[in-house]
Amino acid sequence: MNNWNSITIKISREAEETISALLIEAGSAGVEINDSADYLNHEDQFGEVLPEIEQSELVEITAYYPENMPIVELKAEIEHKIANLADYFSLTGLSVTTNNLSETNWAEAWKKYFEPARITHDLTIVPSWTKDYLATGSEKLIRLDPGMAFGTGTHPTTKMSLYALEQVLRGGETLLDVGTGSGVLSVAATYLGAAEIFAYDIDEVAVRVALENIELNPGHEKIHVSANNLLEGIDKKADVIVANILADILVLMTDDAFRLVKEEGYLIMSGIIADKADMVIASAENAGFFLETRMIQGEWNCLIFKKTENREGVIGG
Ligand SMILES: C[S@@+](CC[C@H](N)C(=O)[O-])C[C@H]1O[C@@H](n2cnc3c(N)ncnc32)[C@H](O)[C@@H]1O
């Protein structure tokens, strides 16, 4: 029977996505995230709002590796990579620890975090190996292999991107999915009626993972995946652009997004930590967009901008 090792990293919340991707690139089949913000404002079974838990600025990210992988070297490699990110994230409170798990613990941890998750009225994310989950009514299943993917697709930034896509897509649109990662947003867009989707990621591994996941779903022929840095060199006009990347990177693409979005089209930006939202809003507004919708979950913001001459219904319009 195989045993497993885990590496747990405590780090500032803003580093969560990058560190998760780094742990998966190092060979983990997935990550488990423990974030106190997820428990804030939750209700108990009687509908009472639970008392606010003191909110830590740190998240705990745990990744699992088979015991035959050299855990000491892996830990050192990961610590080195994190140290190189010191200019991007606060490393205050950082800790990196390892643990040995029995097969039973591993199986439990894995199961707990990769169950089917109904995200919106119509969209449910289902692990690819769950064959017995049946869609009911108008429910559409997004099949993902979290073992290959950047997250399970149930992170607040992804969830809000899905809510936003459901809000703006009506059918027949051309969509650009910048930073496609697992491909989850592109697959969702096919279900929501988009006619043609161009998905980009800067990371070659993400491009491969996205292609593999997209193939698991009907409508995959509508999605074209390629490696690209943001929207550099792209000339495909789009009705909607969606990007779930960190704020500091999103601001680099607002001008290109404005160039490519058709009149009355939308730019959806997610992955924005609360205190950087104003910076992203200013960047998109300077490019010519108007803010139409702002969603907040815990520390995360998702913004829907519109390219329009008609300011009615836009925030501050
Ligand atoms: C948080 S993941 C989002 C994945 C997926 N779209 C979702 O919503 O769950 C961010 C993705 O953006 C990609 N990315 C980061 N910087 C990028 C850039 N400059 N150009 C294109 N993709 C980038 C990363 O490789 C990663 O796959």
From Swiss-Prot:
Q: Which reaction does it catalyse?
A: L-lysyl-[protein] + 3 S-adenosyl-L-methionine = N(6),N(6),N(6)-trimethyl-L-lysyl-[protein] + 3 S-adenosyl-L-homocysteine + 3 H(+)
Protein localization: Cytoplasm
Tell me which NCBIfam families the record gives. Answer: prmA
Q: Which residues bind S-adenosyl-L-methionine?
A: T158, G179, D201, N244
Biological process (GO) annotations? methylation
Which protein family is named in the record? Answer: Belongs to the methyltransferase superfamily. PrmA family.
This chain's protein is named: Ribosomal protein L11 methyltransferase
Q: What does this protein do?
A: Methylates ribosomal protein L11.
In the record, what terms sit under GO molecular function?
protein-lysine N-methyltransferase activity
The EC number of this protein is: 2.1.1.-
Tell me the gene name: prmA
The UniProt entry, under HAMAP family, shows: Methyltr_PrmA
Provide this UniProt record's keywords sorted from A to Z.
Cytoplasm, Methyltransferase, S-adenosyl-L-methionine, Transferase
Recorded GO CC terms = cytoplasm
Q: Which organism is this protein's natural source?
A: Lactococcus lactis subsp. cremoris (strain MG1363)
